[in-house]
UniProtKB/Swiss-Prot annotation:
This is DNA ligase. Keywords: ATP-binding, Cell cycle, Cell division, DNA damage, DNA recombination, DNA repair, DNA replication, Ligase, Magnesium, Metal-binding, Nucleotide-binding. It catalyses: ATP + (deoxyribonucleotide)n-3'-hydroxyl + 5'-phospho-(deoxyribonucleotide)m = (deoxyribonucleotide)n+m + AMP + diphosphate. One of its GO terms (molecular function) is metal ion binding. Its EC number is 6.5.1.1. DNA ligase that seals nicks in double-stranded DNA during DNA replication, DNA recombination and DNA repair. Coiled coil: none annotated. The active site is at 252 (n6-amp-lysine intermediate). Belongs to the ATP-dependent DNA ligase family. ATP binds at residues 250, 257, 272, 301, 342, 432, 438. InterPro entries: ATP-dep_DNA_ligase (IPR050191), DNA_ligae_ATP-dep_bac/arc (IPR022865), DNA_ligase_ATP-dep (IPR000977), DNA_ligase_ATP-dep_C (IPR012309), DNA_ligase_ATP-dep_cent (IPR012310), DNA_ligase_ATP-dep_CS (IPR016059), DNA_ligase_ATP-dep_N (IPR012308), DNA_ligase_N_sf (IPR036599). Pfam families: DNA_ligase_A_C (PF04679), DNA_ligase_A_M (PF01068), DNA_ligase_A_N (PF04675). The gene is lig.
Amino acid sequence: MLFIDFCKILDKIEKTTKRLEKTDYFVELIDFIKNNGKAENLKQVSQITIGRVFAEFENKEIGIGPNLLIEAVKTTGISEKDLKAEIKKTGDIGIAVENLSSNIKQVSLFSQPLTLEEIYSTLKKLSEIEGNSSQKKKTRIISNLLILSNPVESRYISRLILEDMRIGMNIPTILASFSNYFNVNKEAVEKIYAVTNDIGLIGKKLISGSDIENDSELKLKVFRPIKPMLAQLTPSIEDAIIETKMPQFETKYDGARVQVHKSNGKVNIYSRRLENITNSVPELVEEINKIDIDNIILEGECVAMDLSSGKPRPFQDILRRFRRKYDIDKVAEKIALRIYFFDVLYYEKGLIDTPLKNRREILEKLFGTNNWDSELEKIQKEIFSNKMLFSSFKLNSDDPDLAKEFFNWSLSIGHEGIMIKNPDAPYTPGSRVKTMYKVKPTLENLDVVVTRAKIGMGKRKDWYGSYEISVKDDEDNLHVIGNVGSGLTEDDLERLTTIVNEIKIEDLGEEVILEPKIVLEVTYEEIQTSEKYEMGYALRFPRVVQIREDKSINDINTLDDVKKIYEIERNRK
């Protein structure tokens, strides 16, 4: 398949803001591939359209930043001065490269046109290049692609290299296109994506005529991690009890979500971003291997513990463990980890459609019960033990007063609050569900993404000291909700400045526009209505709690979350 044929449809998708039209254009692309291409082409375009070369579950990136792309563009005959001026003018490095390359006589005049397969395989190879001369090799490969491309192709190649296509396409739109073209149930194809996190594989299977609802490759599988199910906010414990009837309460741990996969004696542990962190936590792997279980996927919260106090250590200690690549044993001696398991998603077969109460029974056979109302003495002892693997502390009751006691006890041992779950509910990967709620003692902190950074003043003049922060809507569009600078240490500012310089896509002088990759957890005095921002809300006195390197843009809070918190707080006043 010629890359230019793909680009022509991408251009149509980019020029419309209407979701249904974008869906129709992708349907047109599927039809073109059906009649002119190969099944593999639909896999490739499904991923490329959303700025990916790898499936989401693989947690791999091309790893090229704007600075390296600019170096490659310079070798094609475009000056850095002209390029930066055009980027500033257009706000888009892809359009800047397209505009400037239109004025340059390309070597590709007598060469073969680029194919989709060439682009796809070349970009996959880029991610594998390592070593001392890796930057030069990458620059040369990117340069060759740009020289061989026509102006329109160069726009999309440049964006794809940065894994940001900027055409307003997302997974739900592609799934809707699959549903329309192949006449498959939309809910069914959404569920399949939830357990595979591989949009390309689904496309390839569909165009090959597979019965996707019964295809074993599209079922939940060990060593293919899934996105976690997410909880809703609730105004009160009483409201959540009404929603969940006889709920299961669990401690909301101050830790990091993990998935544990085990089969044939092999153990992999994944973070909530689906990163494989197995090598960073060898003591947990060793403990899991001691348990006589196989072909299983478990979910829990990894907590860094201070065994002298029985309370969790700061969240940053967990990130230190997860990021560590060297001297792991030394760090493990200082930072003790444990996992509180609260779900089993696979045990010899997929269990996500099984009610929580039945999944919990399986979990308790493996790790024992921890019923707060009847086993508190045992629980209190285990908190101070060297034991690493637990089932989560729980309470089954519809008594709000007892639930509040459990809530206060969970806070007293250093954790964040409680979860409230419907015991009859299935597990819905990657969705914020109405069968699971969270209760915390204060305003819910927000996870936001940084979209701009501004040079600081005074002591902060050497760093980016102020950050524009945004949440997302249902269409994954970003909405600014404020600016934050307080709460950041000098070490934080230095680290953030390094990252900003790697991901800035437009330089406005004192301010830069960024790829949305930095996630911050922020607290605030209140959410207030505001005409300053398009979304109509703003954070009053936001303050950074921590840099959430364990989270991506997929994990940030939504506009609906902001509205819900605003309403909850307004009703409390």
